[in-house]
Swiss-Prot record:
It comes from the Eukaryota. Residues 1-31, 52-67 have a biased composition (Basic and acidic residues). This is Uncharacterized protein C17orf50. Pfam families: DUF4637 (PF15470). Disulfide bonds: none annotated. Residues 1-69 are annotated as: Disordered.
Amino acid sequence: MDKHGVKTPLWKKETEELRAEDAEQEEGKEGSEDEDEDNQRPLEDSATEGEEPPRVAEEGEGRERRSVSYCPLRQESSTQQVALLRRADSGFWGWLGPLALLGGLTAPTDRKRSLPEEPCVLEIRRRPPRRGGCACCELLFCKKCRSLHSHPAYVAHCVLDHPDLGKAGAAGNS
């Protein structure tokens, strides 16, 4: 909080602290020679006593100290996660299990009603072919069988009995 009792966001705090430290460092550079000599003497004295000398923070470390760090989430193995999920499911959803089984009974009957099976082309009464064509000469694709269907006497009719063939043959010969 600042002097007025207002909370300041972390990103503003960091910039303000950096500016203050930069100003201190500039002032410190002027008298740094005297301070360095004073700082080295106590460090040597404390090292002889067996204590660790205090670390002087570098620029990179100072920034890291002021920055917000996020701890990574702990990692669990997949088998542990599955076991935890099963325990959680059994507690809350365990009593719903029988009801869910009953709810699934109506679904297959609805599916049968909504998707009627298409009959084979040979089972359907066909309309007469368009453009005055011959019904015996038709080839039809059947979606149910996934193949082509034709009249049983297709070949004999088209080659031997077709009325148009006789007229075309007579016109071709003359």
